[in-house]
Amino acid sequence: MTSLISLALLPLSSLAWDAPTMGWSSWNAFGHRINEDIIRSQADALVSKGLKDAGYIYVNIDDGAWCGRDSEGHLVIHPTRFPNGLKPLIDHIHDSGLKAGTYSDAGHNTCASFWGGDRDGIGTGLYEHDEEDARFMFGELGFDFIKVDFCGGDGPQNSEHLDLDERERYTAISNAIKATGRTDVRYNVCRWAYPGTWVEDVATSWRMSQDIYLGWESVKDIIHQNLYLSAYATKGRFNDMDMLEIGRGMTDEEDKTHFGMWCMMSSPLLIGCDLREIDDKAVALLSNPELIALNQDPLALQAYVVKRYNGGYILVKDVDELRGTTRALALYNPTDRAMNMGIDFFDIDLGEEADVRDLFDRKDLGHFTGSFETIVPAHGTRIFRISADRRLERRVFEAETAFNPSYQELDNNQAVKSGIYEELDVCSGGAKASWLGSREDNYVTWRDIWSNDGGEYEMTINFITGADRNITVIVNGEMIGNITVNSGGWDVIGSTTLKINLKKGENEIILSNPSDWMPDIDCITLTREGDLELFRHRHRQALRDALAIDKSGLPEKMARRFDELILLESDPEDSKETYEKATENLNKIALEIQIALDAQQTFGKTLDCAVRNSGASEESEALASFDGVLDEAVSMVADAELPDVFSDATEKVQFAMKEYLSNEGAILKKGSVWDMTCFIENPDFDSDTHGWKGEPVWGSHVAEYWNRTFEVSQTVEGLRNGFYTLNVQALYRVKANDGGAAYRSGSEVIPAKIYANDSSMPISSLYSHKVSDSALLEAELSGTHVLNGYVNSMHGAEMAFNSGFYWNILPTTVKDGALRIAISSDTSQADCWCCFDNFTLYFQGAEDNAVDLNIDDSDKIDVYTPSGICVSRGMTKAEVKQLPSGIYIVNGEKIIIR
């Protein structure tokens, strides 16, 4: 334990650190295809567009500037890309008041030499040339920054299959830079994952994720990977979230989130677009002085997650003064729907009274008491400066904000016994520190615990473990005790409380177990004896949340029961124990209400389908029995007091519907159809892809395959024999989006097909529907979700499907009670893409019951699918007859086209 007890506390409160690097880098826009004119023009644009004045001063020449080595092993500057050498260009950059950056690799070869086909990069890496190259780059040429990749040191990414040790190589390069005598060189480690805590002693910044690409999914993923790394941005050393894609095609909200979250998380800000083509809107966003101030704040802190909120995240950090009365707050919504988000000032350690300023719009929003909330659009972020009347001592310290000396992302954490951070809904902040213990340095430590006056505190540790595990507690170097705990499950929170003494000022608390695995840690809570404010606040919050849920649509008895349960917990006795119990009960009640509402919605959809099928049936004994079951289900729900009734009633209706539709005594009306979708498992991919073979990718409530051959299938059993129509929304792109030239010329061949037993048909072409075909869709989709006028993402496909696009209608027959449905393609091209959703199945009868079109040749009619989606408006009778085979609704009547 000596290594833990001897740790010194960092006196952070009075220090100011270097800020994250700001500038421009060539890779995103140009790859290795760079030259002197490009770099010079970008440097000039930084100045002319005011970006230099905004703080962007580094001009970084990424991969592509070198061309092997000469006979003596010296680096050769690329003779055609930089015919005048690099020195005149660097001098021009310096003369413009800017700084110049360069690139290399920790191995022999650069990344572009392997992945980009740039053979000129072979042999230009630093390996075996560290000191010589450092003298050349930072002494002779005068570079001020270097990014060092690791393709040449990672066996699968270099032609030599050279495997090097990251720590050894990056440390050696750091030492070579220091040996030049330059102390102002900024050094970026690019290993595409957080390399380990050793890196803060080596580099200025380090990449913590894979390369960014132009797309919302990439931005969202990088933010997610950095949510729980706030403890590792320290002492002016930063987690690098990669270059900025702003101004290159994402939506305005996505660009704002991209820039705003990079600023909140104190990432380096390196513009990645072609500055000669950047628009004024992007320049204005990149130049926002109030967002830049967050990024360049002398405290050099990365915002940490305070709480998760319905799929969104709330982050906060100090600005201007450590533990001062002003904090920056980000409300981040990565979901595909707008949401109301807010925060109680108490939860961000601020007093009741506060002024709020919007940093995107750069305007004061006014004075608020107790809390603040606003609407945050899908993929959006809102960032505020909150200035309060007082600063409170922080009471809750989430484990995902704690530092772990063993943390790294290069090796399997279980193999090397290093801790990680994982999201778990039951945790107070929505995440936990896990896989802790079993080695000396695999522990969690909070190094910034502040006490205004010092003294005795109650420390409550929230933990998760399904087995007996030990925790050693160390406070300011003193071992307080060893505790054995068990919460009773790996998704159950347990807690234990002990008394500790804190000194006035900064303190450090460590939870460890060097000899064996310890429990996962949710958080620690610090309160003084008799301090009930935290527990009162949690209770008020839980009461407010429970009351805010709209119960008006629930059955009267059920809604009244919930109100009575809430009332019972609304006014507990003034003690820690009673507040905690009442809060726990209120949270359970709120969850029960939400489950009831979801179950009610599912029941409603199931009942609607059953009623439609009843209406499509001839009178019969089987129908009377079926209708009787539906009446019973409705009565069950109307008189329900407990939420379980909804699921019971849903199962009752589903079972009765399947029984009825399979009953030979049930008779379908001529010209009508039965909706048999209830026989398909997971037809709409609402939450995942269960029920389907083939493992398609799931997201945005749709399924997809990209860049590959595939088959997704399901066999539906228990069906009547007869005629059916399978409907599914699906699109296929044969190769990279070229605007649909082959589709328009009639030469496009789509290899992907929909199958229903012996029937098959090609999937609809991506190019069969333009985004502009729907004014609503055109208004809602932009940026990377659209390319050349067509949807270009899973979210885009979801929105197009919601607009009624890409229906594929396939008639088929069932002869043995079973129907195999599938989508497959046995060929693929680069960038081919298939996206699909919403399988529906309709039974047309044992015989062909098509209905003649009872309309005049001159009539203009609207055509719908059986589910009410408009296929087309203003069609003639001749045009309707040319529709693909299937079931449609015309003039309120179902018709079948063969």
Positions of PLM-derived features:
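Glycan-recognition surfaces
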Residues: 129-132, 179-180, 184-274
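Aromatic-lined carbohydrate-binding/catalytic grooves of carbohydrate-active enzymes
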Residues: 38, 42, 46-159
